[in-house]
Amino acid sequence: VFMADDMLGTGGTLLKGMETLKENGAKKVICSISLPLFSGNAISYFDEAYKAGLFYRIIGTNAVYQEEVLKREWYVSVNISRLFAQTISRLHQQQSLSSLLDNRDIIGKLLSADTPPS
């Protein structure tokens, strides 16, 4: 199961969602987070949840630097610096952001790469 959220604070809601998914038969849970803040004791809560098998990986962006979470086996950081740079440049030049935000081509390539030949 793939979960996506815009922001992770303490992670309580996300952890409850993972727990519910596992209780209902989910085999592997992967979460993608745009702004992984990991506030308060969130990292230790996710350490415990990972040990309990509630999720496989958390994928977060480097929009928020979290040195401690980068050490975790369960965390994958995705570099979005280029996207930010392109966004700033286009805004400065009063150009459209639509093509930056349209992921249909990327998703199509990923799906076709995973499709076995007939």
Predicted regions and their residues:
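PRPP-associated nucleotide enzymes
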Residues: V1-S118
